[in-house]
Amino acid sequence: MKTPAVGIKNAPPGLHSPQSYDMMKLRLVLILLLFAASAGILAWLYGAATRPPRTAKASPWTETLADLDACCRRKHVKSVLYDNFATIAAGENRPEAERLFRAMAYSERLQEHNCAEAILHLGGSYTPPVRIVLFGGTTDDNLERSIAYEHRGLRERHGAEIGRAMRKGNRYAARILVRASALDLRNAVLMERCLHTGKHSPDSCRFFVCPECGNIYAAERLDYYCPLCFTGNERFVQF
């Protein structure tokens, strides 16, 4: 009896072609790779779950940002109060006091803007205070209250915020804070003079404010350039 030849086409079950062996090997390799990948993922998940939480890196400007934020808020509150005091002075026919309060309010807004820009530059954020208590009283009362507030703030801070910025090597923030402190003192001096001259003084004093840094003058003869930021006096705003 003649035995038929076994070939690819008529091979009995159980006999496989070389291509079938290759497919089986490839499938086995894929299974091993998937197993290894799964094991790696599980190991990573376990490590992530048991790893202690990573603490966020603190900003090197935390103290400086807090000082700038506090300065911004003071300036914002004073600008609102001074505008209110100017309205009261106008009602009492105190034109010099009205102009002074208007000039100081404008100066405070400029300083607030500069402080807020410094905060953003250092990676922080600033939101102005919403609720501000407005005082009434006479113009002389408001002058006395404002003078006391400026002097008290200067005594309490005694330049500490400037020193902190300098020790951190942040001369940009220190410059903003130096200007703010200097203008607080300037405001107090101008208000003391206005309170001293009283309501019967001649209406002759005019005030000028540098539109860049908020430096304020009470003089007819001005510096050619603002000594704080070098802005030309032709740009000064008159009140």
State the predicted function of each range:
Residues 2-3, 10:
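Polybasic, lysine-rich low-complexity intrinsically disordered segments
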Residues 25-239:
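Non-heme di-metal
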Residues 2, 24-25:
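N-terminal hydrophobic targeting signals that begin at the initiator methionine
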